[in-house]
Amino acid sequence: MNTPHIPCLRLGEEYRSFNQSEVKDYRDGSVKATMSQVNAGVVRRDLMQIQKACDALQKLSTRELIDISSKAGDLFLNGNLPLGENGKLQSPQDYLETLSSTSGLPHVMVKR
């Protein structure tokens, strides 16, 4: 199985960092995914361009932002969403199982 990689988002763009962390199954230590991470220097550099992000958000009305958030919440709860960069889809049930296996929480606690 190809291990998915979860990139960082930098001003809305995917960014694969050299600094990566493995997300492991707490029971057997198998790697479920890798995640890019950025350091404070990268965050500071991005903050110098934060006005572009603010300007993009200001172009949307409050109603549009609420609608976007509502749709995102519905997709998160019910949709099959892309996992990582390779286009593989993850169902809500797959997400619960992965979160349970990497956090050690029982499925019932994760689902709350």
Model-based region annotation:
Residues 1-112:
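N-terminal Rossmann-like NAD(P)+-binding subdomain of aldehyde/semialdehyde dehydrogenases
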